[in-house]
Amino acid sequence: MLPTSPPEMAATRLQSRRAFIALFATPASLSACRGTNTASSAQTTPEPESRVAAESNDLVIFAASSLTLVLDKMWQVFRTQPGNEGLAITANYGSSSQLRTQLQEGAKADIFASADVVQMEQVAKAGLVDGNATIFARNRLVVIIPKGNPGKVTTLADLAKPGIKFVSTPPDVPIGAYARASLKKLASDPANGNGYDAKVLANIVSEEANVRQVVVKVQLGEADAGICYATDVTAVPAGEVTTIDIPDSANVVAEYPIAILKSAKAPAAARRLISFINSPSGQSILVAAKFKPA
């Protein structure tokens, strides 16, 4: 971890520059997007708490941190549709592996949206998914460089130079797994030199909790380069970072599955939201945010 700015401080600094409603995933990192709740019980006698919760029209969604901004836009549109005006949506954003662990340890949610299939499969194997997951979006990888390019990284080969400060995530986090897979493909190109992927990984100075923290590290100039999703760059103010494209032959397509969970307290609203995300309107919002359509 770089000593100049721990992840929590870096995240705070970034959030002070851009308005969005997400917090990095911890058991308490829930942010709510609320309207006027019009739901009421038809009973005149008090109901048990568990039954009231079962009849709730409030949605709790666990979603990959790379979806933060686009899902915020989704909520704004979805909640204006008939039947959704009083819906309250609470989103817990973080690395998909962190969210998967929280769910396996008993956290309750209506929907899980992961940045890779692996985490969703593990949640399904734990018996937590209601029905089948569907792929609703795709993404691709880019190399991100801070303003001023202090490491003088101009080509993919430069990532392997001694002394380059490279930032990533652990391999169990989707972006970390995708980045390592892409580096392995790049290692087959003679132009990148022998042992390319091992040299780049040896340059890692910090393994962050999720992709948004990778972007923060690079944006603040605390790393010379990192690999993130192409969509993450759209959230950074113009001029603060530049990118190096990874060719299709070495890129990795990130697939995002979404599913309703058996712990859902608002399954009908969850189904409506997933239907909206997969609809032409929802897909157009994803495309506008630089995601690839399902």
What is the predicted function of each stretch?
Residues 1-15, 19-32:
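N-terminal secretory signal peptides
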Residues 108-111:
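Short, structured active-site "lid" loops
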Residues 2, 11, 33-105, 116-117, ...:
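Exported/periplasmic ABC-transporter solute-binding proteins
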Residues 142:
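N-terminal glycine-rich flavin-associated loop
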